[in-house]
Regions:
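Glycosyltransferase donor-sugar binding loop
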Residues: 39-43, 220, 243-258, 275
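A charged, aromatic-enriched C-terminal amphipathic alpha-helix characteristic of glycosyltransferases
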Residues: 355-381
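N-terminal strand-loop element at the rim of the active site
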Residues: 7-13, 25-86, 159, 250-253
Length: 381
């Protein structure tokens, strides 16, 4: 099958780009021909508070990536639609994660359909359809996009219900396995297995400049208000023996977090790496950590959980969105309320009762259900 995958990809950075590149490899391994149609311009400056949208990593091998789309240029949308249609794909898979992309992607897909042979199927791999940080007009933009698609694959059941809401038609939601083909299908986010093998813990900590042998929890990824770093910092006041490694570029005003750090005298127990983490360094952070903490205030699915699964690190996640679907409470980690005391209790239990060895075994045992083969199969049903 010849597949057009419309998604950010190298040299653009971030979780969507990285996972789409890995998906393209999985599709190719399944015998399909894949072209990734990426963006010449993805975000305007007002939507991207980070330092750069571009990765310094080497381009992935064996992938055909075409930088084509411009999110702000309607003329480009029509041209892009014609270019993709001219390649005569048998299937189109499109990533959707932000309502801002609705006009661009919705228009491109309508042009692709109009210029293609009848029967072309367009499947949206939908990370989010209602964003974590809401803006006026989100619903209209997402609805415009959604009506350009034939079906949807979600990696969190909460997103399925959001699609139901956006389309205004409850009968569209079909999450059961009985249906061979359904408007909305579910497959959990696969494990990120493209970050190399785990390192020995002491070596990883040394490489990161961490000399302390204390229990170490990891908060990893871009720092935004909904990800709840403030909850973790508040929780650390109850666990004076635990250190925290904070790794990721801050998209918020750091002053609010610094105030909590100073209020609870946390500086000596924090290891701050407040920058975007390149691909080749990811293994250092997960190898150094005893426990990954995701204190999110709202979420759908999370790629961070799947990196933790790859490196065999247990997790503390909060009872929001699709996170409880990914972590088995008391086995591969803890599922707790998004409150400092609950997060602190989970961390305390893990270290006080020496749960590392057993929980790491559970994490390794659970990895099998998060396969790329399963996602490919679900997308192409």
């Amino acid at each position: 099958v010849k597949i057009a995958l419309i998604s950010p990809a190298h040299p653009l950075r971030g979780g969507i780009a990285a996972s789409s590149e890995r998906l393209a490899i999985a599709l190719q391994e399944a015998g399909h021909i894949v072209t990734i149609y990426s963006f010449k311009l993805q975000y305007p400056a007002f939507l991207f508070p980070g330092k750069t949208q571009y990765s310094e990593d080497a381009a992935p091998l064996r992938l055909h990536i075409v930088p084509l789309l411009h999110s702000l240029n309607p003329l480009n949308w029509f041209i892009s639609g014609r270019v993709i249609a001219k390649s005569r794909p048998d299937r189109v898979i499109v990533r959707f994660w932000l309502p801002f992309m609705g006009p661009c992607l919705g228009t491109v897909l309508r042009i692709v359909r109009r210029k293609s042979a009848p029967g072309l199927r367009i499947t949206a791999l939908t990370d989010n359809i209602i964003p974590h940080e809401k803006r006026p007009g989100d619903l209209l933009l997402s609805r415009y996009f959604a009506h350009s698609c034939d079906d949807f694959v979600v990696m969190s059941r909460s997103v399925a219900h959001e699609i139901e809401y956006v389309l205004g038609a409850p009968t569209l939601v079909r999450l059961t396995k009985q249906s061979a083909i359904a408007p909305i299908r579910y497959a959990p986010h696969p494990v990120y297995d493209n970050y190399g093998s785990a390192m020995e813990k002491t070596a990883a900590r040394t490489a990161l400049g961490i000399t302390a042998k204390a229990p170490l929890v990891l908060f990893f990824g871009l720092i935004r208000a909904y990800k709840g770093l403030d909850l973790l910092l508040e929780a650390l006041q109850y666990t004076p023996h635990i250190h925290a490694l904070i790794a990721g570029e801050c998209y918020d005003d750091w002053a609010a977090y610094q105030k909590i750090i100073e209020q609870h005298h946390l500086s000596e127990r924090l290891h701050l790496h407040l920058h975007f983490i390149p691909t080749e360094q990811v293994k250092l952070y997960f190898s150094a950590a005893d426990l990954v903490v995701q204190p999110y205030k709202n979420a759908t699915q999370s790629g961070i959980s799947q990196i933790a699964y790859h490196f065999g690190v247990p997790m503390v996640v909060t009872k929001v969105g699709g996170l409880p679907e990914i972590v088995a409470h008391g086995a591969s980690g803890y599922v707790v309320a998004p409150e400092p005391a609950a997060i602190a209790d989970a961390m305390q239990d893990y270290f006080t009762h020496h749960r590392s060895e057993w929980m790491r075994e559970q994490v390794r045992a659970a990895r099998g259900r998060f396969s790329w083969e399963n996602l490919v199969k679900t997308l192409l049903k």
